[in-house]
C-alpha cells in the first residue's frame, strides 16, 4: 500500500544541469539580454585594463598633456557603460532565477498533489517543505546565479588573457602552463562539493522534521519533561549539520588558498619573464602595468570560479531531489467509465492490502456489500484495519488483491476525479485552512456555491449557532488549522462541507471520538441530518452511536470476524458483545 522514498540515484552533473536548463527556456530572451550585457561588462573591464598602458606611458613617462586630458573622460564613460551593463545583467539574471524557482515550486507542488497517498506516509512533510523551499532556491542559483558568475568571471578572465597575449605572448604562454593544474583543482573541488551537498540537504530535512515533531507536540514534551531529551536529539542533528557545513568551508578554504598559490606562482613567473623582456627592450613600463593588472584581475576571477562550484553542486543536489519527485509515478488514473452521480452500491470482494515491509496484511480477504442508502458501521480494536479499509474506496491506496466495486464497476474503471466527487469524508482530525468559514465550507470544487446553499449546509450542521456570534459571521477567519475554533465547531464545519457536497457516499471516520458530550450531541444530530439517502460507512469508537446501523462489520487483525445488526451481534456474545460490554461498564463507572 505504500512506496519507499529512496535517495535519488546519482546521475551525471551535465545531464542534471541540461535538464535543469530546460526550465530556463521560457526566459531565454532575458538570458540573451543578460549575456549581451555581460559581454559589454567584460569588454568594459578589458578596456579599463587596456588604458593602463597610455596612463603609464603617456602620462608618467612621456608627459603627454593631451592624453592626460581625455583619459579621465574615457574612464568615466567606460565605467558608466560597464555599470549599466552590470545592472542589466543582474536584473535579467535575477528575474530569470526567481522565475525558475517559482516555476519549480509550482510544478513540484502540483506533482505532490498527484502522487498516491502512500507517498505521504513514507516522506515526512518537512522533507516536502525543504524541496519546495530551499531546494527550489538552490536550483535557481545553480541554473542562473551560478551561470551569471561563471559568465562574468570567465569573460573577464578571457578578456584579460587576450589583452596579455596582445602585449606579450611570451609572458602569457608562461602563465598558461599552470592552466592544467588549475583545471585539476577545480574538478576535485566540484566532486567534493557535490558529495557533501547531498548530505547537507538530507541533514537539513532531518533538522526541520525534528523541529516540526517537537514543536507540534510541545504540550506532550512539556508534560512528560522531555525538553532535555528532545534538545539532545535536535542538538545531535544540528551538530551533524555543522560538521557537514564545516566540510564545505574547509573545501572552500583549501581551494581558495590553492588557487591563490597558483596565482602567486603565475605572478612570480610574470615578473621574471616580464623583467627579462623589459631588459631586452621588448616591453615598456605601460606593457608591464597592463600585464600586472590583468593578472591581478585573473586571480580573483579564478577564485570566484572555484568557489561557485559550491553553489553549482548544491543546486545540482537539490535538482536531483526535485527531479526524483517529478519522476515519481502519478496515482493510476486510467478510468474511462462515465460517472455523474453514483447510486452508492459498494462491494468489497476478497480484498487484501499490505504495507511494505510488513509480513501480515493490513486487510485480508475482506468481503461485504453496502447497499445504497444504508449505514454500514465498522468497529474493532485499534489497528484492526478499519481506517485502511475506508481509504481504499477513494483510492488513496490500492489493494494488493481482490476488487472494490462502486455500482457494479471496479473503482479503477472510473476517473479519479469522478470517483472522488461521489464521496464526502468527515474524519476525527478535521483540517481547516487559514481562511474564512465560508471558504472552508465551500471548499475546492464547491467554491462557487451560491450563498443560499452554503447557509443551509451550515444550518443543517448545527454550526450557525456559533457562526452567527462571530463578528464577521461567515467571513470570520478560522486561523491556522482552524485554531480559533473548538474541536466541536471544527467538526460541525466539516459536516457542513459534506452537506454542501451532497455526495452519494459518506465516510465518517470516528467523527465524534474526541468530543465532549454536548459537542457530540450537536455533531450526532448534524450527522443524522446528513446520512439519509446516502451510503454511509461509519468507523465508530463509541458503539452506542451505531446501534441503528443497517449492518455492523467487526474487524480484528485485518479480517471481518463478525457481521450483523447491533442486536444480532449482542446476541452472538462474540467480540462485538465483549467490546460493547466494556464500554457499558466504563460509562457506569
UniProtKB/Swiss-Prot annotation:
Residues 32-314 form the ABC transmembrane type-1 domain. Keywords: ATP-binding, Cell inner membrane, Cell membrane, Lipid transport, Membrane, Nucleotide-binding, Translocase, Transmembrane, Transmembrane helix, Transport. SMART domains: AAA (SM00382). InterPro entries: AAA+_ATPase, ABC1_TM_dom, ABC1_TM_sf, ABC_transporter-like_ATP-bd, ABC_transporter-like_CS, ABC_transpr_lipidA, P-loop_NTPase, Type_1_exporter. The keyword Cell membrane applies. It is a multi-pass membrane protein. One of its GO terms (cellular component) is plasma membrane. It comes from the Bacteria. Its main location: membrane. The keyword Cell inner membrane applies. ATP binds at residues 380-387. It catalyses: ATP + H2O + lipid A-core oligosaccharideSide 1 = ADP + phosphate + lipid A-core oligosaccharideSide 2. Coiled coil: none annotated. Its EC number is 7.5.2.6. Residues 346-582 form the ABC transporter domain. The chain crosses the membrane at residues 29-49, 70-90, 157-177, 261-281, 283-303. Homodimer. In MsbA the ATP-binding domain (NBD) and the transmembrane domain (TMD) are fused. Belongs to the ABC transporter superfamily. Lipid exporter (TC 3.A.1.106) family. Involved in lipopolysaccharide (LPS) biosynthesis. Translocates lipid A-core from the inner to the outer leaflet of the inner membrane. Transmembrane domains (TMD) form a pore in the inner membrane and the ATP-binding domain (NBD) is responsible for energy generation. This is ATP-dependent lipid A-core flippase.
